[in-house]
UniProtKB/Swiss-Prot annotation:
Encoding gene (name): 2A6
Lineage, opening ranks: Eukaryota, Viridiplantae, Streptophyta, Embryophyta, Tracheophyta
Name of this protein: 1-aminocyclopropane-1-carboxylate oxidase homolog 5
Record flagged with keyword Oxidoreductase: yes
GO molecular function, one term: dioxygenase activity
Keyword Oxidoreductase tagged: yes
Record's keyword terms, sorted: Iron, Metal-binding, Oxidoreductase
Length: 398
């Protein structure tokens, strides 16, 4: 055999080998695509059957299940990140600020403003005590949410809906049918409360009165917090209020039933909030975690405290001075349900036509605008979109 023929055979053999490898890769890819389509179809069927019960995750637990449905299974890489928490030696915890000094003399108020500003810049999260809402009101609010979710399912079903334009609705996983990601282990009561609150008779009977009372007190607290946050930005105390940041809020009553396999799912997946700020009332079970220095840090319940976190819209108008930190809730592995009530202070549900962008007084040659101007409608449409793979705020960066 001549040298040329030998070389030809070698080249032919290599080509055949490459062809076989390529064919194997194509077959593997096609198999993966078929499996993905089957899994997607299975998930859709599961989601449809789950949704039609109108009893949420609470209904699954009440049925006595020992294993969670596959549609709740969180991807392995996300589950691995559950272990990426701060080591005990660091003893990281979000700041706690006593608001009592904020309404006293100038020196005390300045100290409170500095603490809030530092927490908003470094953490995006902090807890507040002496905030003006009594423990009695907070306990009644938590009990009201518990009673709603644990009442007769036939009564709850009257509020069940996926129409987020309604003022009052109950659901489990609002995006259940709009994306293929794993469902979360929780149920939600959502109520639009300000500036045009629903009529008392339109709210659930078991918690309507306390929701109205709690909402009014939250409005007062929210306005006070925006004064302190304005001052922390070096602005007039009324600046953020004059921008309409405090005018609107929606309250969620979150119910996290005990999960038989808490290591396989989440209570809420990693996300940022769409609000200017969020005011959270939580019970003593815990489960909320926030990203800080690339570690997950537990937001441990503090008796009588409320958790405050900066939302995307405040990060935008502060031009990244304050941060909207990613956070999540791990699945409830305790024997009791976890109750929490976030109040999103934002015009997200009923947007106004106002244009929002980085506050001009905060900009300079050294600190140019990092975001383009936008309307709340534009932001909310992006926030709800399932086509983006990163926080909605990134979409508006210049």
């Amino acid at each position: 055999m001549g040298h040329d023929s030998f070389c030809y055979l070698i080249v032919l053999r290599c080509a055949l080998r490459c062809g076989i490898i390529a064919l194997m890769q194509i077959c593997a890819l096609q198999k993966k695509e078929r499996r993905s389509k089957m899994e997607s179809s299975d998930r859709s069927s599961q989601a449809k059957a789950f949704d039609e019960t109108k009893t949420g995750v609470k209904g699954l637990v009440a049925s006595g299940i020992k294993e969670i449905p596959a549609m709740f299974h969180t991807p392995p890489d996300t589950l691995t990140s559950l272990k990426q928490t701060a080591p005990p030696s660091q003893q990281l915890t979000i700041p706690t600020v006593d608001l009592k000094g904020g309404s006293m003399d100038l020196i005390s108020r300045r100290s409170v403003v500095e603490k809030i500003g530092d927490a908003a810049e470094r953490w995006g999260f902090f807890q507040v005590v002496n905030h003006g809402i009594s423990v009695e009101v907070m306990e009644r609010m938590k009990e009201g949410i518990r009673r709603f979710h644990e009442q007769d399912p036939e009564v709850k079903k009257r509020f069940y809906s996926r129409d987020h334009t309604r003022d009052v609705l109950y659901y489990s996983n609002i995006d259940l049918h709009t994306c293929n990601k794993a469902a979360n282990w929780r149920d939600t009561l959502a109520c639009y409360m300000a500036p045009d609150p629903p009529k008392l008779q339109d709210l659930p009977a078991v918690c309507g009165e306390i929701m109205m009372e709690y909402s009014k007190q939250l409005m007062t607290l929210g306005e006070f917090l925006f004064e302190l946050l304005s001052e922390a930005l070096g602005l007039n105390p009324n600046h953020l209020k004059d921008m309409g940041c405090a005018k609107s809020h929606i309250m969620f009553g979150q119910y996290y039933p005990p999960c038989p396999q808490p290591d396989l799912t989440l209570g809420i997946s990693k996300h940022t909030d769409f609000s200017f700020i969020t005011i959270l009332l939580q019970d003593n079970i815990g489960g909320l975690q926030v990203i800080h220095d690339q570690c997950w840090v537990d937001v441990s319940p503090v008796p009588g405290a409320l958790v405050i976190n900066i939302g995307d819209l405040l990060q935008l108008i502060s031009n990244d001075k304050f941060i909207s930190a990613e956070h999540r809730v791990i699945a409830n592995g305790s024997s009791e349900p976890r109750i929490s009530m976030p109040c999103f202070v934002s015009t997200f549900m009923k947007p106004n036509p106002r244009i929002y962008g980085p506050i001009k007084e905060l900009l300079s040659e050294q600190n140019p605008a990092k975001y383009r101007d936008l309307t709340i409608t534009e932001f909310s449409n992006t926030f709800r979109s399932q086509t983006i793979s990163h926080p909605a705020l990134h979409h508006f960066r210049i």
